Amino acid sequence: MSETNKNAFQAGQTAGKAEEKSNVLLDKAKDAAAGAGAGAQQAGKSVSDAAAGGVNFVKDKTGLNK
């Protein structure tokens, strides 16, 4: 193999490895974002549930929940 072909081959290998690493990092970032989204969604539900409980408490104490 000529030196030019060898260098081109090695450059192709390096580019392929870099692309694979970037794909792995993107997958990890997607997984982290999905996990954060699920956590935020659960936190939002908890806040909503707590607020609803607070409203019901006030209604009970003020006699509006009849």
Curated annotation (Swiss-Prot):
Q: What induces it?
A: By cold stress, abscisic acid (ABA) and water stress.
Please provide the record's keywords in A-Z order: Repeat, Stress response
Query: Where are stretches of biased composition, namely Polar residues?
Result: 1-13
sequence-type repeats, residues:
31-35, 49-53
Which GO CC terms are listed, alphabetically?
cytosol
In this chain, composition skew of type Basic and acidic residues spans 17-31
Q: Does the keyword Repeat apply?
A: yes
Share an example GO biological-process annotation for this protein: response to osmotic stress
Superkingdom as given in the UniProt entry = Eukaryota
Q: Does the keyword Cell wall biogenesis/degradation apply?
A: no
Q: Ranges of Low complexity compositional bias?
A: 32-45
Q: Where is this region: Disordered?
A: 1-52
Its name, as the record gives it, is Stress-induced protein KIN1
Give the species this sequence originates from. Answer: Arabidopsis thaliana
Question: Highest lineage ranks of the organism?
Answer: Eukaryota, Viridiplantae, Streptophyta, Embryophyta, Tracheophyta
